[in-house]
Amino acid sequence: MSFQATPTLLHLAVRSLLRNEALAVSGLQDLPVELFPPLFKEAFTHKRFMVLKAMVQVWPFPCLPLGGLMKMKASYLETLQIILDGINILLDQKVHPRSYKLRVLDLRALHKDFWNVWAGDQAAAGSLEVKRKKKTQNRGPRIVAKQSLKVFIDMCFKPRALDACISYLLLWVEGRKGLLGCKKLKISTIALRNIVKVLEMLDLDYMEEVEVCCTWKLSTLASFAPYMGQMRSLRKFLLSHVCIPVPISLEEKGKLIDQFTSQFHNLEYLRELSLDSISFLEGQLDRLLRCLTVPLESLSITDCELSESDLKSLTQCPGIRQLKHLDLSGVVLTNINPEPLRILLETVAATLKTLDLENCRIVDSQLSVLLPALSSCSQLTTFNYLRNPISVAILERLLCHTARLSRLTLEMYSTPWEIYGAQGAFHHKRLEQLREELSRTMEPLKHTRTVWFSIIPCPPCGY
């Protein structure tokens, strides 16, 4: 036997309204504000398109968070078309009733709680999504001047064709410059031509996060750069796998790099920068760093080749002096003087919270130079030193230094190389001895801490 919850008075009222769509539409002007979210949700669920189209035109909140109800997939295409038809009617009006409040149609997968609220004050929280530079007001008693409306969406470009809903939306916004805003953009395709067409439709001022995760040539990146420079609200930029064609002159290479790096002058809100597997970075990092206009909170340079001069330029960059997160994993430092990295750690010691040096191939002699600087990072909470060859002796010294860091809660290391035999065989007895020794080292600590050891040998190092 199954039991179903008894419908509330609210749900009964909503269902009663939807039994006659024409009657429901005629009564929208007198409908209490609190009934709009549940009525819209019910009409959406049961595809009462006449009601949906009419409700869009008299929506009593600044934001209609449609993305909290639907995904931008083909199965919702008809519903999206109806909603946009209603928006069309609004856009064609020269003046609106004073009750008109809609400023944002949000198609992002957010605000799912909105549709479960009843109180008007909670529902009005959607207005936080409104980001307007200017307001036009008219104190007339019955009408207000036409104001701008924004449609927000998160974009993801993949090698396959765009989803039906996205394609329809892009057709709908053609000729309506500045109507479509995007805060998160992900690019997973090398075909820039189609991306540019969409970028030219977007109001790029609203862009906050961009992720480029495909194999672009340096020339492709340079062509994308002017659009990036228009993203003046950009806070997070992730770039991976940019390669350089073999037949390219140093002059041409420098010109393309400058086309990209010069755009950072415009990014006054940039806080997170991630560069992964960027082949042009070695010896060129200073070109980018000197274009940073604001302090970064997070810097990730991973699986890249860097020179000693690149590390020195990091220590001299004002934009990294307030770093909270530093990730250099996969940057091989074996043959590089550790002094620049030591200075870098000292520079960010007052703010650094996470440090990732996984697979940097740092050897004991280099680590010894870094220890005093590492122990001065008073805000450090996480330290990743996996896949670096380390001896028992230097590990014990390292733990003595990190023991001074009261906020450190997680440390990750590879098992010292002495634990392995000549052929890389793992010796459990040696590991148990090491555990006992390290436990004695950690006993004086006055706070909880996790020290994690990997027993997987590092193939490149042989440990």
State where each predicted segment sits.
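Helix-rich alpha-solenoid scaffolding regions
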Residues: 53-92, 228, 234-236, 244-275, ...
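Short, solvent-exposed loop/turn at the beta-strand->alpha-helix junction
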Residues: 19-23, 33, 48, 113-115, ...
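Extended amphipathic alpha-helical scaffolding regions
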Residues: 153-157, 168-173, 182-187, 192-200, ...
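Short amphipathic alpha-helices and their capping/turn residues within compact interaction modules
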Residues: 18, 22, 36, 40, ...
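Cullin-RING E3 adaptor/co-adaptor recruitment helices
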Residues: 1-218, 243, 386, 417, ...
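Conserved hydrophobic beta-strand positions in leucine-rich repeat
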Residues: 64-67, 100-108, 155, 178-188, ...
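A structural signal for leucine-rich repeat
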Residues: 197-202, 222-231, 248-267, 285-295, ...
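Charged, low-complexity intrinsically disordered regulatory segments in eukaryotic signaling
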Residues: 1-6, 333-342
